[in-house]
Each structure stands twice: as C-alpha cells, then as structure tokens.
Amino acid sequence: MKKRSYLSILVAGAMCAGLILSGCSSEGGKEPADSNSPAPQVSTSPESEYPDQAAADNVAALIDAIYVQQRTEDTDAQCTAAKEAWDALTDAQKELVSGEFADPDYFGRDTGDASLDDPRNQDDIGENELLVVSFGTSFNDSRVADIKSIEDALQAAYPDWSVRRAFTAQIIINHVQARDGEYIDNMDQALERAVANGVKNLVI
C-alpha cells in the first residue's frame, strides 16, 4: 500500500516536471522584440528602381505603335508623341531604347537632310496629274537622289501636268513624319487629294 502511494507520488512529480519544462521551452523560443531592428523593406516598382530604362521603354512602345502598315485617325498624334518623348531622353537613355521594332537608330540615325526633299503633297493640282507611286524610303539622301529626281524630271518633261507623290509603305511614311516632320501621302490620301482637287486625268 505504501509502495503504491510512493509510486503514485513519483509519477505525479514527473508529470509536473514535464509540464514545467515544456512551458519553459515554449516561452524560451520567443525572443523579445528588438527596438533597434531595421524596418521591413518596401518593394519598389521597376519604374522607380530603374527610371532610365522605364523612360526608354516608354519611347520604344511609342515607336512600336507607329511601326504599322495601317494609318488611323490617331497616327498623326502618335508620331508627334513618339518624337517628343525621344527628344526628352538623355543620350544615355536613348541608348537603352529597345522594342519589337524600336531601336536608337529609329530617331537617332542621320540619313541626310530632309529639307532637301519635296513631299509633293500640295493642292492646286489642276485637271492633269501624274502620281508617282513607290514603296518609299526613310533614308533622306536616297529619297532625294532617287525618288525626287525622277519626280523632278517628270515635272520638267510634262509642265502641263502636276506631279504628285504617294508611298505604299505606311511604316516608312510614319517614320519620316515622326522623325523629320515631313508628311507624305499614302495611296488613299493621294487619291482623295486628286478627287478633292477636281483632277480629270490621272496617270499613275
């Protein structure tokens, strides 16, 4: 009887010791907060972390938007926006421009003096028109030497006819317009111009 009571006391004591140790272990795992610990880092967006690249990417997106074959009612404004955004970049930012079609050469490459060209998009055509149609080129020197020289020769040979120009590549038209501020008609625009001017004899 005494032995059983002694055994019960030992078991009860062991259980109490286990509970005490368990409580100490769980409390000991919690460290007091350090008032001097740094505040958690706040994640930053790529735009705020890399502002130069963000500015360059914006220009690349604007260039890609006008590197298309379809002209819309927004094309003129898009061309202007792309050039203004490019002009606002630093030289270092311009080197970062890269898109599906965009690169620093789109605005940065020197292809000659665009002011030497004549887009031949004037009204007052008269009744007779020679419409010179080509794919076109955005290289200013080549456009002056090749396309313009042919148009000038035709105008000299046929003084009673008005020589006008149309490009079939809207991508090139947009490029020249955005970069140099030169407006060249596409085929639809050229034909609409002929109708608006009352042209009766049109040779393409």
Question: Locations of the language-model features?
Answer:
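Core hydrophobic alpha-helical transmembrane segments of single-pass membrane proteins
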Residues: G13-A17
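Bacterial signal peptide processing site
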Residues: S25-G28
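Active-site-proximal alpha-helix that buttresses catalytic centers in soluble enzyme cores
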Residues: P46-E49, D105-V203
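C-terminal motif of bacterial Sec signal peptides marking the signal peptidase cleavage site
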Residues: I20-G23
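Beta-rich interaction/scaffold domains
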Residues: V42-D110
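Intrinsically disordered, low-complexity proline-rich regions
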Residues: E31, S37-Q41, S45
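Compositionally biased, low-complexity segments enriched in small residues
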Residues: R4, S37-P40, V59
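Bacterial N-terminal signal peptides that target proteins for export
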Residues: K2-L10
